[in-house]
């Protein structure tokens, strides 16, 4: 469950979110719609722990402000609208990076069977397993977006948040 309680946040001293509260039970889906500049991305950044706020965001009863980044990554996977493919990495490497955000070891250190299977499953889910050895920055824009979606899936988070997913 996600609980957002009396959250206010913004940029340069100007609040975009003002005293926002809601809860989202486990297993439920939520779509946030609105015009440009209304706070959709700001809300997702706050919920992912990337933007400080006044108020509290809780996942399964625990405040995200008290979670370490790796712990937060195990709970929440965010696909941002502004993601860029790292230069000269393969599709598989980019997806693997999402998996290793939760680990203490580096990208190219030995992985266990679970890591490899999570990466494969994520790439198969988005239909890119066959392109896993291609340089990711040579793919079309839509394919690159699917790479980042697979990267979030490889984390196997409890909560997936998509910012401008279309």
Residue ranges and their predicted role:
Residues 55-63, 72:
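Conserved ABC transporter NBD signature motif
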């Amino acid at each position: 469950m996600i609980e957002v309680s009396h959250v206010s946040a913004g940029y340069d001293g100007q609040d975009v979110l003002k005293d926002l509260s809601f809860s989202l039970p486990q297993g439920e889906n939520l779509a946030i719609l609105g015009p440009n500049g209304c706070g959709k991305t700001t809300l997702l950044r706050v919920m992912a722990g990337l933007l400080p706020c006044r108020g509290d965001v809780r996942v399964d009863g625990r405040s995200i402000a008290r979670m370490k980044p790796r712990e937060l990554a195990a709970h929440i996977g965010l696909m941002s609208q502004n993601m860029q493919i790292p230069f000269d990495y393969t599709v598989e490497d980019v997806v693997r990076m999402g998996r290793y955000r939760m680990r203490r070891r580096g990208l190219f250190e030995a992985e266990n069977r679970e890591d490899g299977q999570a990466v494969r499953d994520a790439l198969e889910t988005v239909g890119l397993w066959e392109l896993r050895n291609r340089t990711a920055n040579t793919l079309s824009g839509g394919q690159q977006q699917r790479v980042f979606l697979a990267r979030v899936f490889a984390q196997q988070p409890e909560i997936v948040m998509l910012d401008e997913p279309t």
